[in-house]
């Protein structure tokens, strides 16, 4: 529950030929911390991701109550499959309400096309692999671990600094868990 008993959801926009590997670690962090993750698509139902997996999304984007969204996540891939006004309009509404919006690889292109990257630092205009500026996180495909960690930090998913450092050591530095 968020402030005032408001239900909050972390929404992941999936689509045919999206790159699921770019968001697998982030989804793990969300689920492991009890977050209410909703997989949506333009039309509810089965999508086939770039890696060949079939995923059944539980909601169409048009059915998402944007006032209950804590974060909105867009992986990269063939973004022509989400090049629709409903996506851009939803992003603008979420952005204006301060919702965390995260796009990796071509997902960041969608944020740019929606006009959300004007006047902020992003992986689209900078030489950085992963950038957080206010309520927007963007990353290049190779930065999927940094993307997951930065988004998790923005959502306050880590118990404390030690939890964060253990996560970095395990996922980014490939050190064994103690």
Task: Describe each PLM feature range.
Residues 1-7:
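Short, Lys/Arg-enriched N-terminal segments with co-localized hydrophobic residues
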Residues 49:
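Acidic surface patches and DE-rich sequence motifs
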Residues 9-18, 24, 28-45, 53-178:
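Active-site-adjacent pocket-lining segments in enzyme domains
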